């Protein structure tokens, strides 16, 4: 930053001006003196001030060294500054063009001109650097900027070479369009290339090199890549690197440059496969150059087929086909196809033509591929938001000048003519048209030279094309003869025959001389026709069109072979592309950077006055200075000027409505601004401002005014936006209200309809509620079922003995029955789960009793509510009975015991007894003595009961068990209980029989029988009556 401040001080300090010179030649006192002009340039050059203005034209002197004037601090310092606020710099020119592009929407182009070695390529890089630094930092923008910046290393590697005058000379012309969006961020780009010097591929002058990429590949590729390409690092291995021993330049690091190229290719979206194919093509050219030929009986033969095989592999073609195409030529003459062998000279020509064509088309493909990567993704950008940068080869005068120098110098003539048209001529013509008082400035108009070269039917280009296309055997010599014949009298054409004696001594007979605007150049016609025809034998095109290498196949399409049209000559194509370039530049607002080479040695701090003066002359800088000094710095149409600055006067703001239109408005505006008449002139359609300071002051006032107007507009705008917002919100609320009201009304109507439908359906359902389900009562029935289920869930019985059950609608009766049964089972299950073992035993006995006695014996009902007990012996007798059981039963198990009354078989006298039930027998004990009276096995006896309400039991004893003693007649309290235990013990109910009679017979001793009558009375009892027994049961 310190060096920048010191430079700024040197540029602006008055006491430093004598030492550093003036920064704008317009300020030079003796502005008509060439000596003063050169002296000012030299002063600044010696102080490392390489930039100087002529008005808005920037003069750049190549320092041949790195200067610290392109840092980020410099970019910030020059950004958004007026042109003359800062010292001269390429950043100032770029910023001025950039702001005009964005703020005024005027297409711009930066024209960089000068001869070879004057620093044009470096200047174009600095323009790109400033644009990249000033644009946005979004991810997409960064991607575009990276691609724009990385395109330079690629184009320089393949299109630049070391010449005797320049280590990095552009051997092609380049015009780059950069497209911006409305915010000034680059969104894409496009590159046009012009006339690559492809002859350099096969031969170079002494001390010069081939294109950089060949040396970069050999120096920077890793061993694996070199092995794949079959290359060696030694430069003298390859014939096409003719200066191989001296090919390494200390100022150039080819290995680092190759890594930069690889990185740039990756950034610009070249795939790994594409990069491999590109380097393969470059390597194939080196191998092709080493292919030699011998001549056997007039036919060329390849010396080393291995080299052809290697080149064919890298190009992706058949080696045999490539070898045949290099040594033979096929001619199709009106359907007659003839293949003839080539001699050694023609084979070498075919080989070199192939190498040049492959490299030339590879370069064109690279540019196309770059353009695809740089293509803007947005299509809405204004067509005027484009800035062009022209970096084209400078004027060249070599010891030996050929077809390439002729084309390059023709291009420079056209650019010089454009410069004259847009500056010297057009500016003076404009003053005359506008009625501005003006003293004409004389200048050399090179249009006469351009016409000499390109005039139809008469110019050198037409003569060259005519000679190339005519039948017969045209040669370079016949071409020169025709030139001399037609142009000998032209003041800018010199031939050997009519040249002055002193020129004849240095001119050869195969040369002609043109007096260019930049000086006299002698051209050798050798190779003019050949290079113009640009002939590549059809056999080679056919071979390459079938290549496996995708890039080669793309560069040599099959449709080219099918075309019968003769291709345009090289010079015709070049002229057409140049004219197209001129059309592009004419529709843009130019910014000029005129580059000057201080010496031919490429050495820092050396200033050759004579060389610089020569460049100043032919660039027309003195004439440009005189026009600028006498002219006006700024001019604009009244409409544009008024539109931009009308806010500076109340008379013209917001719109001028007075008489006289925009011109009168501008006059009123400058009057209100208080301008002196010397500061401006009023033309017919434009306002001319003499001094930049006047415009800058006006612009500063406008920028200040913009803030005031912006505040007013902002306030009104905010008010308008708030009102619009309010109205929009109000409208939205009204719409929402209407929608809500409509929705609510729809919902209410829907509810009413639904309610009516429900009521209607309910009534119909109610009417048909007992019918089979139909369309009317289905919902009602379903609702009835639902309500019944809900009611049932609340009214379910909770006790087993509670047999009540809620009433069910008709359609639910079946389900009600099932649910009732299931609920009963459920309650029973719950009850059962709560039972103790004793309770469970009781229920088992009770169930057994119910099964046997219910409905069969009248006193069964009285037994239900009483728990069955296994022991019915009174307490006072229990011990004695238990003693009997313990002494008598043994393994038998006591099941039941009770007291009872036994009646004799004769006389029916009653006796107290105890009856015991074991698992095997019935025991009858004496009621007093506790002695066993009977033991009756259960499997031998059975029991008879009556169906009356009595406790009578007759035990039928088989005759073989009791010898004629007969049956036992017993009155047993709780007869149902005792009988149930018997049946439970035996396991079958058949042991007990119930008779439905009023009398019961029983067996007596010796087969005699007795009768027991059964009667019903108020009280139970037993009566003995005349030989029979009467049992009285209750009702």
Swiss-Prot record:
Domain IQ: residue ranges: 696-728, 729-751, 752-779
Gene disruption phenotype: Viable and fertile, but adults have a shortened lifespan. Flies deficient in both Myo31DF and Myo61F are viable and fertile, but adults have a shorter lifespan than single mutants. Flies deficient in Myo61F show normal left-right asymmetry of the embryonic gut and normal, dextral rotation of male genitalia, and the same is observed in mutants deficient in both Myo61F and Myo95E. Mutants deficient in Myo31DF and Myo61F display stronger sinistral rotation of the male genitalia than mutants deficient for Myo31DF.
Tissue note: In the embryo, expressed in gastric caeca, midgut cells of the proventriculus, and in the mid and hindgut. In the larval and adult gut brush border, expressed in the microvilli. Also expressed at high levels in follicle cells during oogenesis.
InterPro entries tied to this protein: IQ_motif_EF-hand-BS, Kinesin_motor_dom_sf, Myosin_head_motor_dom-like, Myosin_TH1, MYSc_Myo1, P-loop_NTPase
Residues annotated for ATP binding in this entry: 114-121
Stretch list, region Actin-binding: 578-600
Chief place where the protein resides: cytoplasm
Subunit relationships: Binds F-actin.
Record's function text: Unconventional myosin that functions as actin-based motor protein with ATPase activity. Binds to membranes enriched in phosphatidylinositol 4-5-bisphosphate, and can glide along actin filaments when anchored to a lipid bilayer. Functions as antagonist for Myo31DF, an unconventional myosin with an essential role in the establishment of body left-right asymmetry.
PANTHER family: MYOSIN, UNCONVENTIONAL MYOSIN IC
Notes concerning its domains: The myosin motor domain contains the derminants for the direction of left-right body asymmetry.
Protein name: Unconventional myosin IC
Organism the protein comes from: Drosophila melanogaster (Fruit fly)
Gene, per the UniProt record: Myo61F
């Amino acid at each position: 930053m310190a060096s920048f401040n010191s430079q700024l001080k040197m540029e602006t300090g008055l006491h430093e001006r004598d030492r550093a010179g003036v920064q704008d030649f317009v300020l030079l006192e003796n502005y008509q003196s060439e000596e003063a002009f050169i002296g000012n340039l030299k002063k600044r050059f010696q102080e490392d001030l390489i930039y100087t203005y002529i008005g808005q034209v920037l003069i750049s002197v190549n320092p041949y060294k790195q200067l610290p004037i392109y840092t980020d601090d410099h970019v910030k310092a020059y950004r958004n500054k007026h042109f003359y606020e800062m010292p001269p710099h390429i950043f100032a020119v770029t910023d001025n063009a950039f702001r005009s592009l964005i703020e005024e929407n005027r297409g711009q182009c930066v024209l960089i001109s000068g001869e070879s070695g004057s620093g044009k390529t470096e200047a174009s890089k600095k323009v790109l650097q400033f644009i990249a630094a000033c644009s946005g930092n979004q991810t997409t923008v960064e991607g575009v900027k990276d691609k724009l910046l990385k395109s330079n290393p690629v184009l320089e590697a393949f299109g630049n070479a070391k010449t005797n005058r320049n280590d990095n000379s552009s051997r092609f012309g380049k015009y780059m369009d950069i497209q911006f969006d409305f915010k000034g961020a680059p969104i894409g780009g496009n590159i046009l290339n012009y006339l690559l010097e492809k002859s350099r591929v096969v031969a170079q002058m002494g001390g010069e090199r081939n294109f950089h990429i060949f040396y970069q590949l050999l120096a920077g590729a890793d061993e694996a890549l070199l092995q794949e390409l079959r290359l060696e690092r030694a430069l003298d291995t390859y014939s096409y690197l003719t200066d191989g021993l001296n090919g390494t330049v200390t100022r150039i690091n080819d290995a680092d440059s190759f890594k930069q190229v690889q990185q740039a290719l990756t950034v610009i979206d070249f795939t790994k496969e594409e990069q491999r194919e590109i380097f393969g093509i470059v390597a194939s050219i080196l191998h092709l150059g080493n292919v030699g030929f011998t001549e056997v009986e007039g036919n060329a033969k390849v010396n080393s087929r291995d080299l052809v095989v290697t080149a064919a592999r890298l190009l992706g073609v058949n080696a045999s086909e490539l070898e045949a195409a290099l040594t033979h030529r096929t001619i199709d003459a009106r359907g007659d196809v003839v293949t003839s062998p080539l001699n050694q000279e023609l084979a070498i020509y075919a080989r070199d033509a192939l190498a040049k064509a492959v490299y030339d088309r590879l370069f064109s493909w690279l540019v196309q591929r770059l353009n695809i990567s740089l293509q803007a993704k947005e299509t809405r950008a204004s067509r005027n938001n484009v800035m062009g940068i022209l970096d084209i080869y400078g004027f060249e005068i070599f010891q030996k000048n050929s077809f390439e120098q002729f084309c390059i110098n023709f291009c420079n003539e056209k650019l010089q003519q454009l410069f004259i048209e847009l500056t010297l001529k057009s500016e003076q013509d404009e003053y005359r048209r506008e009625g501005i008082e003006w003293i004409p400035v004389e200048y050399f108009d090179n249009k006469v030279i351009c016409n000499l070269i390109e005039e139809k039917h008469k110019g050198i280009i037409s003569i060259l094309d005519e000679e190339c296309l005519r039948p017969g055997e045209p040669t370079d010599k016949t071409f020169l003869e025709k030139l001399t014949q037609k142009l000998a009298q032209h003041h800018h054409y010199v031939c050997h025959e009519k040249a002055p004696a002193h020129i004849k001594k240095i001119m050869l007979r195969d040369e002609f001389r043109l007096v260019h605007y930049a000086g006299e150049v002698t051209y050798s016609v050798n190779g003019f026709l050949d290079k113009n025809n640009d002939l590549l034998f059809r056999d080679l095109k056919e071979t390459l069109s079938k290549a496996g290498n995708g890039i080669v196949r793309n560069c040599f399409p099959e449709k080219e072979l099918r075309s019968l049209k003769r291709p345009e000559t090289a010079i015709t194509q070049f002229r057409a592309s140049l004219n197209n370039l001129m059309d592009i530049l004419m529709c843009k607002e130019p910014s000029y950077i005129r580059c000057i080479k201080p010496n031919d040695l490429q050495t820092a701090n050396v200033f050759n006055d004579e060389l610089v003066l020569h460049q100043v002359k032919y660039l027309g800088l003195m004439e440009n200075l005189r026009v600028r000094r006498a002219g006006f710095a700024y001019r604009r149409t009244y409409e544009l000027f008024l539109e931009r600055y009308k806010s500076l006067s109340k008379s013209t703001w917001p719109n001028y409505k007075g008489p006289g239109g925009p011109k009168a408005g501008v006059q009123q505006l400058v009057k209100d601004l208080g301008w002196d008449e010397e500061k401006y002139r009023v033309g017919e359609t434009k306002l001319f401002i003499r001094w930049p300071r006047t415009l800058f002051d006006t612009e500063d006032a406008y920028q200040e005014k913009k803030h005031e107007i912006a505040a007013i507009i902002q306030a009104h705008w905010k008010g308008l936006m708030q009102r619009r917002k309010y109205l929009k919100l109000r409208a939205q609320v009204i719409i929402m209200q209407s929608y809500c009201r409509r929705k609510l009304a729809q919902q209410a109507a829907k509810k009413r309809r639904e309610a009516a439908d429900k009521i209607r359906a309910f009534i119909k359902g109610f009417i048909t509620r007992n019918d089979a389900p139909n369309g009317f009562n289905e919902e009602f029935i379903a609702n009835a079922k639902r309500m019944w289920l809900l009611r049932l869930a609340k009214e379910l019985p909770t006790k087993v003995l509670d047999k009540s059950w809620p009433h069910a609608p008709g359609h639910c009766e079946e389900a009600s029955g099932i649910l009732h049964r299931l609920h009963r089972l459920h309650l029973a299950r719950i009850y059962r789960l709560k039972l103790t073992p004793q309770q469970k035993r009781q229920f088992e006995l009770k169930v057994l009793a119910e099964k046997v006695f219910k409905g069969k014996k009248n006193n069964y009902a009285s037994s239900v509510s009483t728990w069955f007990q296994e022991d019915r012996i009174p307490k006072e007798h229990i011990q004695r009975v238990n003693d009997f059981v313990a002494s008598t039963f043994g393994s038998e198990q006591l099941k039941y015991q009770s007291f009872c009354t036994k009646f004799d078989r004769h006389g029916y006298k009653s006796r107290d007894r105890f009856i015991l039930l074991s698992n095997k027998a019935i025991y009858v004990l004496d009621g007093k003595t506790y002695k066993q009276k009977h033991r009756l096995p259960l499997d031998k006896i059975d029991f008879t009961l009556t169906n009356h309400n009595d406790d009578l039991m007759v035990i039928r004893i088989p005759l073989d068990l009791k010898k004629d003693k007969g049956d036992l007649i017993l009155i047993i309290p709780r007869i149902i209980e005792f009988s149930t235990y018997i049946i439970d013990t035996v396991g079958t109910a058949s042991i007990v029989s119930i008779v439905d009679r009023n009398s019961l017979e029983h067996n007596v001793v010796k087969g005699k029988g007795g009768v027991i009558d059964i009667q019903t009375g108020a009280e139970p009892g037993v009566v003995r009556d005349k030989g029979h027994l009467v049992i009285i049961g209750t009702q």
